[in-house]
From Swiss-Prot:
The keyword Ribonucleoprotein appears for this protein: yes
Transmembrane segments: none
A molecular function GO annotation: rRNA binding
GO cellular component, one term: cytosolic ribosome
UniProt superkingdom: Eukaryota
Annotated family: Belongs to the universal ribosomal protein uL6 family.
Protein's name according to its UniProt entry: Large ribosomal subunit protein uL6
Length: 190
């Protein structure tokens, strides 16, 4: 039996401006603007009032109905991003050769040197809107920040993947840069 209608609403906070036009969602907050297209999904998206965004699917299959909640989660992440921002902390782990990390090009590129004593310099470019800095509070720590959770996590993943150990037993050679903490730039009141 097919579901006739499936819908979800996203509440938009007071300090956030949101707009939907032809399945392109734009969210503006204190930290900037995020824009995302959902044109690849056959869903109805509209704003019944200023503070509510409704995602709706009529006569959908199982996968199409699942996409309704997925889109809402993406929009909630956009709202959280422009309000608080996303921050990933990464730690350099090494047994013998100290890994040297240097940021360049206005904190958008990181150069990783002396990984396992290699002379090769690994350069990792961050996604647009993402910055990476060396932590002042903690030794061997990188802080990756941005408003878009997918860009931040993707950039952190690229850094981690750049330090994969080749032709060695990975159970023994654990050197690399790993994500140690996922948090927000503006600390949440708990």
């Amino acid at each position: 039996m097919r579901t006739i209608n499936s819908n979800q609403c996203v509440k938009i906070p007071k300090d956030i401006k949101a707009s939907v036009k032809a399945r392109v969602v734009t969210i503006t907050g204190t930290r900037g603007t995020l824009k995302r297209s959902f044109k690849h999904l056959a869903l109805d998206m509209y704003m019944p009032d200023k503070r509510t965004l409704k995602v709706e699917k009529w006569f959908g299959t199982k996968k199409e109905l699942a996409a309704v909640r997925t889109v809402c989660s993406h929009i909630e992440n956009m709202i959280k991003g422009v309000t608080f921002g996303f921050q990933y902390k990464m730690r350099a782990v090494y047994a013998h050769f100290p890994i040297n990390c240097v940021t360049s090009e206005n904190n958008t590129v990181i150069e990783i040197r002396n990984f396992l004593g290699e002379k090769y310099i690994r350069r990792v470019e961050m996604a647009p809107g993402v910055t990476v800095v060396n932590s002042t509070a903690q030794k061997d720590e990188l802080i990756v920040e941005g408003n878009d959770i997918e860009s931040v996590s993707g950039s952190a993943a690229l850094i981690q993947q750049s330090t994969t150990v080749k032709n060695k037993d990975i159970r023994k050679f654990l050197d690399g840069l790993y994500v140690s903490e996922k948090t927000t730039v503006v600390k949440l009141e708990s």
